[in-house]
Amino acid sequence: MEELQGYLEKDGSRQQPFLYPLLFQEYIYALAHDRGFKGSLFYEPAEVFGYDSKSSLALVKRLIIRIYQQNDFLSAVHDSNKNQFVSHHHKNLGYSHFYSQMISEGFAILVEIPFSLRLVSYFEKKEIPKSHNLRSIHSIFPFLEDKLLHLNYVSDILIPHPIHMEILVQILQCWIQDVPLLHFLLFFLHKYHNWNSFLITPKKSIYVFSKENKRLFRFLYNSYVSECEFLLVFLRKQSSYLRLTSFGPFLERRHFYVKMEHLQMQHLILIVVCRDYFQGTLWSYXXXXXXXXXXXXXVILASKGTHLLMKKWKYNFVNLWQYYFHFWYQSYRIHINQLSNHSFYFLGYLSSLPRNSSTVRNQMLENSFIIDTVTKKFETIVPVIFLIGSLSKAQFCTVSGHPISKPIWADLSDSEIIERFGRMCRNLSHYHSGSSKKQGLHRIKYILRLSCARTLARKHKSTVRTFLRRLGSGLLEEFFTEEEQVLSFILPKTIPFTFYGSHKERIWYLDIIRINDLVNHS
């Protein structure tokens, strides 16, 4: 990393670092390995072909030599008919996958460099303290609770995916002016597509690319979502003379590299909360957050204006993707709903804004009046059906929610099995601590607890009842003790608390920057 910083300092006379020569440096690939790929870059190919971990570095050096002969190298990597590396066809495919993966992850490291430097300089310039708290997923919900209470209509939209790879590269031209690097990326993507055309259909090509080159794909996809965000904010500015009032404090959350910091489940969520043209101020808010594994980005558009205003914005979205991104998007996929009678799924919660009516009798001297008042309350509820679906896919229960054993965990030790189930319970409790109603969360905990008991009983070839009788309350304490200890520091001592979490307080944490797979149903 010191060598990399030294190169960038020497190149500081340029407007932007020239990144292409770094593809020929071994420490770039070592840096990619050290930044959390869990050895997939070096060790997985070594296991497949019988090499030890040290000899994988020799493959990296061979890769660098091949990059000097760009056309021959990429053709050899991605054309299974040319056999320049090894003589056997299957080994050629394996080496091709290894080399393409190294290029992909090495390139992803390079393109993150300018955004990393820009992020550091921005924070130093603005002197923003504790910016990591602003990137917490839970920090979004208090904002929604504050703003949505005054609005009428909402549209929850999925940014269309996928778009053509060339469009993604064109978007990068606005961020990176290194022409050789962009040409190399485009050539690499074309060769990758041609190679996979022998194995898969064109429709599945981008899906396979996203699975095999996760870091690079997420970088390209986040650049696309960031471009959508920039254009939407620009359109909103052009449509109204009203200035942004609450946009400034969250400006650093729109920074591109912030969206890239946690790449395992990292995607952008753009929330645009606006009013009618002549009825008040405009709020615009963007946050980096974890999204579904299917790489879906959500746009929440809410308005205090009329249904016609929302309909105009609906067609703005359609025209934006059709004419700017060359992506055909059906207008019927965007639904406009009233906030008072609509629940939308957002970041692992079912959010709604129900109306509560109450009657108050007012006595003034000899006259009495009956006043009907209507209040709104922002509610966030655990999506039980979605979570049960996720548990069913993970083989913890049936589709109807009946707990079953986890056979693949039966070979683990008892303590490891209990620890894994307990960790899942604690993670779900931690994330869904902001739920208005805890009954759904208790049901999910019950499913996991009984699934744990069935797994242990299966391992010891016993019945669940016999095993629980022998185990006693130890299993229950494993699932709830840690949650009780955490909440005891947060809730006042006067609030009663039991193992079953009977409290109704909503708690939002500032340390949640990604969503567990089971939180998302997709």
Curated annotation (Swiss-Prot):
Example GO molecular function: RNA binding
Name of the molecule in the record: Maturase K
Any one of the GO BP annotations: mRNA processing
Top-level taxonomy: Eukaryota, Viridiplantae, Streptophyta, Embryophyta, Tracheophyta
A cellular component annotation (GO) from this entry: chloroplast
Keyword vocabulary terms for this entry: Chloroplast, mRNA processing, Plastid, RNA-binding, tRNA processing
Primary role: Usually encoded in the trnK tRNA gene intron. Probably assists in splicing its own and other chloroplast group II introns.
Main location: plastid
Family: Belongs to the intron maturase 2 family. MatK subfamily.
Location(s), subcellular: Plastid, Chloroplast
Gene name per UniProt: matK
